[in-house]
């Protein structure tokens, strides 16, 4: 497919040829000839969306309450996996540390209170709190896929934390 674009009254004369297209500037017109295959462009468009999964909005989000809902993203410092869930240490807005305990049951599709996502390679781990007013409604935890990442940690005495995972949706700490 060859496309030609003509523009009038270009101020100077230059010509340039670079990989895949040619440009010619003149005082009367600008001719831009793009030599590209429509098939190659469609294949590139298809590959850009391949593998991406669009996530549904958090449960409970409707048009009537959408103005009251908001989210807060906070960086994750350390995550400890436990048989009952995850202990997450994150950095608050004032750079102090806070922790939250996320029970495994919250991540099940039946309960639907939390989602664990794998972060792309160059994205730092973060925790998203979805709030309605001052009430926590949903949590997204985005972590590296590799357990060898320095973000993942091991609890020294996991049995000490058993009672901490028996929680309701608590209000997270954002700042002091």
Swiss-Prot record:
It comes from the Bacteria. This is Uncharacterized protein TP_0437.
């Amino acid at each position: 497919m060859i496309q030609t674009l003509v523009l009038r009254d270009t101020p100077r004369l230059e010509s340039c040829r670079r990989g895949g297209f040619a440009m010619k500037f003149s005082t009367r017109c600008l001719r831009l000839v793009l030599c590209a295959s429509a098939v190659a462009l469609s294949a590139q468009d298809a590959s850009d969306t391949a593998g991406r999964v669009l996530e549904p909005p958090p449960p409970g989000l409707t048009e009537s309450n959408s103005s009251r809902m908001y989210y807060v993203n906070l960086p994750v410092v350390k995550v400890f996996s436990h048989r009952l869930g995850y202990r997450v240490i994150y950095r608050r807005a004032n750079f102090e540390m806070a922790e939250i305990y996320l029970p495994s049951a919250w991540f099940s599709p039946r309960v639907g209170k939390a989602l664990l996502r794998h972060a792309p390679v160059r994205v730092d781990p973060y925790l998203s709190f979805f709030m309605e007013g001052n009430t926590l409604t949903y949590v997204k935890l985005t972590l590296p896929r590799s357990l060898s990442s320095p973000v993942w940690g091991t609890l020294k005495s996991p049995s000490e934390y058993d009672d901490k995972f028996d929680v309701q949706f608590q209000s997270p700490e954002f700042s002091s």
